[in-house]
Design a protein with these regions (language model features):
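Residue-centric detector for conserved, function-critical "anchor" positions
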Residues: 1-40, 44, 107
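Residue-level signature of catalytic and energy-coupling elements of molecular machines
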Residues: 38, 115, 128, 146
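Basic, short loop/linker segments at the boundary and entry of helix-turn-helix/winged-helix-like folds
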Residues: 12-19, 60-119, 141-143, 151
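Amphipathic alpha-helical interaction elements
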Residues: 30, 120, 137-138
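DNA-recognition alpha helix
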Residues: 126-138
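Short, basic alpha-helical nucleic acid-contact segments in DNA-binding proteins
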Residues: 148-156
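Active-site phosphate-binding and catalytic loops of NTP-dependent enzymes
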Residues: 44-59, 155-156
Length: 156
């Protein structure tokens, strides 16, 4: 019996030992690694592991998770970003913000560098998405996002 796996985004099965299967597993490992880093960061801030009862040592509480699509160098990856409320000194609560995956971050630094490299090579903002289609693999990229990225480059 031949080993098969389902291709992400479709019901078509592909052989488990092909280049597509390798990329699929790598994307899965990237997703797991990003989620583990975010969980570690949140546990450090809260002072407790998920579902742990530690009493006064806890600095806040979890309250669900939301999906976020992050475009990595292997294509788009959907991660579950945990949410938490942090207790302040005066008893006020604030929403936790991850330092690992920033609030409006949609691409990794390597993807941003690739976008800037294509732009600096002379490609106009509308054609960059087509030029980087193999890298982005359907990940979102608008001409406005490219313009904002170039604007940040000009400021630096």
């Amino acid at each position: 019996m031949e080993h098969c796996t389902k291709k992400p985004g479709g019901d078509k099965e592909i052989p488990a030992y092909t280049a597509d299967a390798i990329e699929t597993r790598m994307r899965e490992r990237i997703r797991e690694t990003i989620q583990a880093l975010v969980e570690e960061e949140l546990e450090a801030v809260l002072g407790a592991e998920k579902s742990a009862r530690v009493g006064e040592a806890r600095q806040g509480y979890r309250h669900g998770a939301r999906e976020r699509t992050l475009t990595t160098s292997l294509g788009p990856t959907t991660i579950a970003m945990p949410r938490a409320r942090l207790r302040g000194a005066a008893g006020a609560t604030t929403e936790w913000r991850s330092e690992t995956v920033r609030r409006y971050q949609r691409r990794t630094t390597r993807v941003d560098e690739a976008i800037l490299g294509v732009y600096l090579a002379g490609t106009n903002t509308r054609r960059i998405k087509g030029a980087l289609a193999p890298l982005l693999r359907g990940g979102p990229l608008s001409k406005d996002a490219v313009s904002r990225l170039v604007g940040r480059l000009r400021i630096q």
